[in-house]
């Protein structure tokens, strides 16, 4: 992310409590600055549907009654469609936290601005950045997270001792016109306690 180009992702962590090396224990969200705010929706669901043909948009319906689609942008991508190739079913549902979108278009220039959140999200130009990344194009930009921010579904502290598995999910359901959907991009994770 860089200033005006945040694609906030929700971070979840899991301890391998049963010791089997698989991510089959409880996931805990690492709360961010928007946790507990009225406009933040917990247990938000979005169901996506496989397109009927190549180069078609992916339709969706959300648990708050909205519906829409993820635009197929052939100028940017060459795959048949954006529906995940590894999912054999004709629809799938994602559940998680949905943040209020902060994307706006400048009426003079036509450029889109995806504003950041204070802290606690990946691919976000917030105040939890770790020194070293570019503020111009986002290369090398890193966000820092605290394991102490892990919470149960009811918002109480999880008190994790460590994290074995990490899962990221886009935190907004929004489009920015000709740029397409607001999405989260993550390239790596690093344990900063070592």
Describe each PLM feature range.
Residues 29:
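Conserved hydrophobic ligand-interaction patch in extracellular adhesion modules
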Residues 33-136:
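Low-complexity, serine/threonine/proline-enriched polar segments
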Residues 12-16:
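Predominantly extracellular/luminal cell-surface or secreted proteins
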Residues 2-3, 18:
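Helix-rich alpha-solenoid scaffolding regions
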Residues 137-194:
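Ser/Thr/Pro-rich, low-complexity mucin-like regions
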């Amino acid at each position: 992310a860089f200033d005006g180009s945040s694609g906030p992702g929700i971070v979840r962590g899991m301890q391998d409590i049963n010791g089997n090396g698989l991510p089959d224990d409880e996931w805990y969200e690492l709360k961010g600055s928007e946790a507990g705010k009225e406009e933040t929706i917990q247990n938000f669901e979005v169901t996506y549907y496989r397109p009927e043909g190549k180069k078609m948009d992916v339709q969706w319906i959300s648990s708050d009654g909205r519906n829409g689609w993820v635009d197929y942008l052939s100028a940017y991508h060459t795959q048949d469609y954006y529906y995940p190739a590894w999912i054999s079913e004709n629809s799938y549902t994602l559940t998680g936290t949905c943040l209020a979108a902060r994307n706006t278009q400048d009426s003079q220039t036509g450029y889109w601005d995806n504003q950041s959140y204070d802290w606690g999200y990946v691919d976000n130009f917030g105040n939890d950045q770790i020194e070293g990344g570019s503020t111009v194009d986002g290369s090398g930009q890193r966000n820092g997270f605290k394991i102490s921010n892990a919470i149960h579904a009811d918002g109480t502290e999880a008190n994790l001792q460590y994290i074995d598995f990490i899962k990221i999910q886009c935190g907004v359901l929004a489009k920015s016109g000709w740029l397409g959907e607001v999405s989260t991009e993550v390239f790596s994770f690093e344990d900063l306690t070592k």
